[in-house]
Amino acid sequence: MSMVTARRRARLQSILAAQVAAAVTAQTAALEIDELRLYPVREPVSGRAWTVVRVKTRSGLAGYGECAYASSKDLAAAQRFWAGRPATSYASAPADSPLAGAVDMALLDIVGKASKAPVYRLLGGPTRSKARAFTSVEGAGAAVKRAIEAGYRAVGLRVPAPAARNQGQAYQLELRKLVETVRSQAADFVLEGAGLLTPGDAASVAAAIERWHPLWFDEPTTIGSLETLRKIADESVAPLGFGRDIRHAGVFQDLLRAGCLDVARPDILHFGITGSRRIAALAETYYVAVAPCHEGGPIATAAALHLAASLPNFFIQHIPLPAAAEDRAMRAQLAGGDLERVKDGFASLPNGPGLGITVNEAVLEKYHAA
């Protein structure tokens, strides 16, 4: 190679490098976070409330997420932290912020839109083409029938709250009647304890329901003594699920080490997609399945479905199904009517860029929660 040719090649390489660097710099600047905004919303009939977080970049690209609640003070702190940072830094969110999960969803939404790819592809998926779903019902009978007609093949049943400790046979008969309403519909069920039972009552219920093969017994009692939870797990083959009220990932690790967790349930409104994936990775090393908890709106549903499509140990996803038609219509108007539609027990994955939904901000304003 002649000296002239070498110089020309070096010059060409430097020009190309400068062009690539300029393009990367421009793209990074376009993804710099400029503004965060809160939209507290509430379903008109049930009163279920959550907070939508919109994150905008300097180029005008917007992403959306959800959290349970955030104050103006929380928003100001998040604005100070995120302003000027690139949307690609979603994994660095401060875990103690109430907005952490929502901002995580919103930033992944932005990165997906900028990349023209669904979020699950950014996360290495899809691991499946659809996600199994269940919904919680209040009471039995008509509520279970409504869920089945809506396409669900699994429901969550709230355990009857005992009037006192050690209810004995009468309580077991009441529980049996509740479960029979689901079995008569040929549906699977999750028994939701919601931490209402004492450890003794929880152990008794766990032993009683194992014959009916529940998907799992959710929050059978409060998370206190790991030895007590281990005893409940050892005395019944009914799988145990925890996570609805857990706010620190280390608690999942403690439960896994103690051998008293069969279904990990990180709250996607708190942990977001990234935090939930970290917990799922930890659970996978113990051969434990993941069924994320979700009590928010349709934006979180979209995030949960992308999460499901990225997890090898995903089990089933909870999706809220309001009893009132007005509430269901509000959710459909907010993010698209097909998003939360379930067919034969499965929800379809959103396939558009980012979270794959178009958020109607007029609906956010209409159902603003004072």
Residue ranges and their predicted role:
Residues M1-A26:
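N-terminal export signals
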Residues S14-A18, A329-A370:
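C-terminal extensions of enzymes
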Residues A23-Y64, A68, K73-L75, D327-R328, ...:
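Structured beta-strand/loop patches that form or line metal/cofactor-binding pockets in enzymes
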Residues K56-P118:
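Metal- or metallocofactor-binding catalytic centers and their adjacent structured scaffolds
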Residues G60, V103, K116, V155, ...:
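Conserved, mostly hydrophobic/aromatic
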Residues G65, A131-S136, V155-L157, F189-G193, ...:
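Hydrophobic faces of well-ordered beta-strands that scaffold small-molecule active sites
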Residues K73-L75, R80-A91, G224-F346:
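Shared catalytic-loop signature of beta/alpha-barrel
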Residues S129-S236:
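Metal-dependent enolase-superfamily TIM-barrel catalytic cores that perform enediolate-based chemistry
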